[in-house]
Amino acid sequence: AKIAIGYRMDEIKNEITGKTKACFEPALDYVVVKFPKWPFDKFVYATRKLGTQMKATGEVMAIGRNFEQALMKAVRGAEISHDCLADVHMRALDDEALTAKILAQDDERIFAVYEALFRGFSIEKIHQLTLIDEWFLAKLLHLCDLEKRLETEPLTHDFLRELKRNGFPDKTIARLSGNSAFPHLPYSYKMVDTCGAEFAAETPYFYSTTDEEDEASAFIAEHSSKKPVVIVFGSGPIRIGQGIEFDYASVHCVWALKDAGYEVVIVNNNPETVSTDFNTADRLYFEPLTPEDVGDIIRVENPVGAVVAFGGQTAIRLTKWLSENNIPILGTPADSIDAAEDRGRFEALLKQLHIKQPVGDTVHTAEEAIETANRLGYPVLLRPSYVLGGQNMIIAFSDADVKEYMDIILSHMEGNLVLIDKYMMGTELEVDAICDGEDVLLPGIMEHIDRAGIHSGDSIAVYPAWNLSPAKTAKLVDYSTRLALALNTKGLINIQYVICQDQVYVIEVNPRSSRTVPYLSKVTGIPMVDIATRVMLGEKLKDMPYGTGLAPISSYTAIKVPVFSFEKLSGLDTQLGPEMKSTGEVLGIAPTMREALYKGLVGAGYQLTDKGGIFITVRDTDKDEIPDIAQRFADLGFHLYATAGTAAVLRDHGMSVTLVHKISESEHNTIALLESGKVNYIISTSKKGRTPARDSVKVRRKSVELGIPCLTSLDTAVALADILKSGFTPDTAELVDICTLQK
């Protein structure tokens, strides 16, 4: 930016050293590895092959004294259920299948290459197969040799230090050697300085290694401010379900802690975030968020407390270890977090509070799941415990669905239970609240346009809720207050509800920051993270100027609309459900709900037109509702196209509709219709559609290729028809200054 306005490089100071200029050639005594984070653990049917189109949702960065150390850090920091490059699935393949995997050019290729080297494939052969530079292959072979030695050699002090120097964590060493009776060799910390230690760096930005010199300890001793230290754990790589919203919360927490007079340390490994800017916190450690990797940071920093509430599930997973090692956790205690996640404890709490929840149970096996599903009655909702973004969460309609989904869930989970609930179709609402142990502040209640069954991150959310009666509002405030207090919450809590047959049920409670905190903070003007941080430090809500209970409702409407990246993941079904698929969101603000929704949809990339054709094909359970929706589009002048079953229903209701054949029935089929340019919108729902072979999935994938808006939620279709009827255009939509509105 400075160069753009006329500065020369010899006039710009290097902020890291504080002494050299930007023209000074960097000299690095460390190696950096960037490792992508792919979404294939969530999207098991998406095409994994990598090419020129980006498929990663995020990345981690790792720094080490050598390539091996940095690579091993990156692998375990990517949160892909690997603590090294050895992969049990690759080890089970024969040589022919392994060679095919190497040639596949997908996200698992590095593990296949490592396994081939471990088996004795030559570097030359793998280079011929992959064109990966032999330097990298030699480094992987070095790690293979160390793994083989682990299986046969005793763990002497020198060998242990060699392993640690090449990135092997204690957990991996113990597993591969079968020996856990060895001492932990503490990490030391080196400073990132860009000048090979020629000058003393001024930016406290550290990475771990096994050198004897500990530059972090020396820096702390030299620059001690005598302020108490707090460590904030970040959220790791951006992935679907855990995005930049959590970094927003982490950074605002850092600022609030600084304002309160604390020295703040950030631990994170995501180079895309503000939290890992070297000047955000007082000190930054670029490290994986695992117990071993953070343990020595805690030893060096000696904090008065640690913050896990703003780092998503990545930070929450550290809670148990922190508690067991007597590290003070600022905010909601570890036991309360467990009480919200443990099915038995949470059910007992709700019974004690006389609050309803959907009936359900916990299971360990596919057999138990099928038995439970039949007892509850289909459809049922399955999800692993302790997940974020609805990963591997699905609605099952049959025993076959349960069997298929349990196989997927059990292959990805790490020893947690699977929860099964009776699926309840109703209005879903969401509350973010702040509790200080005595009082509760609710900045707002959000209502989803899409009914329960679609993940909250993929639903269109509206603030303020527009369908709530005063009685229901009072009940939500009462339930939220009692839940927050009963869980001994100190800070933020997120609660999701469903209203079904006029009854309020609790779906989920998360005593931590959520992905809606930035949205609600900005549209209400209430600095939720700042307040929550102050509460975690012991301040009381009644001593702050924001009040308690439900905050005053705004006079404007703010709508959060999800953004999807379906065009980047071929083979992925676009039908929405309980597993989150969106990669971002936009905000529409206006005096009315319709105008706010119009702005949100346009901002999310929808190509809106008020005339043309609409193709409709829906599952049997939606055929009672589809006539009213189709009539709305017909009244706007849209020509209706539909497959046989849907067309019959629409004709029975007196509508004119063109019959379209399924893909397998004729060459004049749905795909041909979409390619003809006659269709401007698609409404497509199907009972089961995860596998790409089904007609419904092919239709939805074709819509992505052609850029035709495809609605898989009937509620979104109704909302779309309403805003098309309103006739908003970019010229007529009102420009809104939210700061003025808040006044």
Predicted segments with their positions:
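ATP-binding N-terminal substructure of ATP-dependent carboxylate-amine bond-forming enzymes
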Residues: 74, 191-355, 364-371, 589-740
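Cofactor-pocket helix-loop regions in the catalytic cores of large enzyme subunits
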Residues: 117-131, 149-198, 202, 614-624, ...
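Acidic/histidine-enriched active-site and ligand-binding environments that engage anionic O-linkages
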Residues: 371-380
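ATP-dependent carboxylate activation and anion-phosphoryl transfer catalytic cores
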Residues: 1-149, 153-159, 163-167, 222-228, ...
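Conserved A3 ("GATE") glycine/threonine-rich loop of ANL adenylate-forming enzymes
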Residues: 341-344, 387-391
